[in-house]
A protein has these predicted regions:
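ATP-binding N-terminal substructure of ATP-dependent carboxylate-amine bond-forming enzymes
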Residues: 1-104, 123
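Active-site nucleotide/adenylate-binding loops and adjacent lid/helix of ATP-dependent enzymes
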Residues: 95-154
Length: 154
């Protein structure tokens, strides 16, 4: 039986539990806190910023994935040194750390996207809002937002 390690014990990791069971996959979760949403499958509680802890976790699984984009790529690079497959790759994860970089990368690949733009300053605000279809529209922080945090409907 393959063992998948998930870094992050949030909602997405929690949703992976029944899917893993149905597929016959053993799931281990590296959670940040005891009471995380994925507590049912949590096998390690610790700091995913600690490369030594992540490397130790990586030795017990066949592949590592993550339940959010905030895992630093350096940490995953260290885990990969243990010989564990990281999927998606740390390089792919890098594209998700900044929504502007992600959108630009998707555009270069020809991936369909909703209308979007970057408000650089107060003066560009009206032009960008007009270009994306006017009000109401969604404004997002390029870095650090998730689960509605850093998101505003205007």
């Amino acid at each position: 039986m393959k063992t998948v390690g998930v870094i992050g014990g949030g909602q997405l990791a929690r949703m992976m539990i029944p899917a893993a069971i149905n597929l016959g996959i053993h799931l281990k979760v590296f959670a940040e806190a005891e009471g995380s949403p994925a507590a049912l499958a949590t096998t390690h509680v610790g700091n995913y910023l600690n490369t030594h802890e992540v490397r130790d976790f990586a030795r017990d699984v066949d592949v590592i994935t993550f339940d959010h984009e905030h895992v630093p790529t350096q940490v995953l690079e260290e885990a990969r040194k243990s010989g564990t497959l990281i999927a998606p790759s740390p390089e792919a994860l890098t594209l998700t750390h900044n929504k502007i970089v992600m959108r630009q990368s998707l555009a270069k690949m020809g991936v369909p996207q909703p209308l979007w733009g970057v408000v650089e300053d107060v003066d560009s605000r009206e032009e960008v809002i007009s270009r994306v279809g006017g009000f109401p529209c969604v404004a997002k922080k390029p870095v650090g937002g998730y689960d509605g945090k850093g998101v505003r409907i205007i």
